[in-house]
């Protein structure tokens, strides 16, 4: 079995560098922001953080390929680093501290690339989460100061906390009725958004979360952290992993019900 612990240590080094770069420009009055063709914002900090990570990887892992949100895919091979330099750019540019750098290492396996290392670093919140395949999921500020994550044991929707990002995507995909039905069945709903609800599923403070449209870089790190914490991460089609263009994550006990509601009348 491959040992990915050296890759995890590298992911922490990458995150440390990205944290310094992104925090340096967070709330800067002269922050430059552009609009991408898909009408989403990108800041100078997004680009700088991804370039920084790519530079480190080119020196530390020259044979690995890289797939980043801002600069696409570079290289080929069985190992691929997937990077979202700032997940939550809209929050970042408005001074909201809920944003993070997402770093995943994916390896070619049967059925395609699968995440084997994942790290989420949210420096404005002072939080970091990570996981390695078959080694569990953890949170802390460093490898030497961490505690293990476990999903909740909640087994009924009436006791469950459900998190999401926004309503518009569910309506655009014709899934709003099922989504609203689900919100009526659960104990609590909150629109935490972006990476955060997945980390809370892994921590056991949220039981369910879902988003109707995502890219690989939005999901790769989140997926392995949730699953290594004992949870379930699939697309809305039930396919395991971050490959469906959308996501559903849970403590596992409620996953079938989550998918059932979000797929009804669709």
From Swiss-Prot:
InterPro entries: His_9_proposed, Inositol_monoP_metal-BS, Inositol_monophosphatase-like
Reactions catalysed, as given in the entry: L-histidinol phosphate + H2O = L-histidinol + phosphate
GO biological process, one term: L-histidine biosynthetic process
Reported effect, residue 118 to R: Requires histidine to grow
Record: residues binding Mg(2+) 2: 84, 87, 218
SUPFAM superfamilies assigned to the protein according to its UniProt record, in alphabetical order: Carbohydrate phosphatase
Originating species: Streptomyces coelicolor (strain ATCC BAA-471 / A3(2) / M145)
Knockout consequences: Cells lacking this gene exhibit an auxotrophy for histidine, but can grow on minimal medium supplemented with histidinol.
Keyword set includes Nucleus: no
Protein name, per record: Histidinol-phosphatase
Gene name in the database record: hisN
UniProt GO MF annotations: histidinol-phosphatase activity; metal ion binding; phosphatase activity; phosphoric ester hydrolase activity
Function: Catalyzes the dephosphorylation of histidinol-phosphate to histidinol, the direct precursor of histidine.
Family note: Belongs to the inositol monophosphatase superfamily.
UniProt enzyme class: hydrolase
Residues binding substrate, per UniProt: 69, 86-89, 190, 218
The protein's required cofactors: Mg(2+)
Superkingdom of this protein's organism: Bacteria
UniProt pathway annotation: Amino-acid biosynthesis; L-histidine biosynthesis; L-histidine from 5-phospho-alpha-D-ribose 1-diphosphate: step 8/9
Binding site for Mg(2+) 1: 69, 84, 86
Keyword list, A-Z: Amino-acid biosynthesis, Histidine biosynthesis, Hydrolase, Magnesium, Metal-binding
EC number: 3.1.3.15
